[in-house]
Amino acid sequence: IESYIKAKIDGTPIPDSPINPIIQGAVLKFLMWEKQNDIKFVASEKKVYSLKHNVAGICDFLYLNKDGKTCLGDIKTSKGIYKTFYLQLAAYKYMIQEEDPKMQIEDMTIVRVGKDDAELEVKNINDYASNAKAFLACVILHNIMKPIKKY
């Protein structure tokens, strides 16, 4: 599923249509979401890094919404949308804006594509401040736990 979507975002040739009808359905729903929301992809697999916190990640895609505002998105092939995904997107936004303070990210979007049922679920994450705070708390906790030896 992700390889078809990534090819679409990158503008590279889309692989032959998948034989599996579930995957076909998921890809079609993604393409419909893109068209219905007038999405313009501007980057995929964007590497992001925070010098301040020594963390890095790869954002699945950046896009322009119908208002021309820059948004970031992440594709998930899970059974649901979980709170940890919110922190991940907030982390990406935090790192992007640390790298380029002038870059404004309007929305953070999770696109969940079901592996088993061709379901497409799209969730915009509106509470950046709380999720960024939680992400930074996780970084602090990770750094505290790092030197603790296993018993």
Feature map (PLM): residue ranges:
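Nucleic-acid nuclease catalytic cores
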Residues: 46-151
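Metal-dependent nuclease catalytic cores that hydrolyze phosphodiester bonds in DNA/RNA
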Residues: 1-56
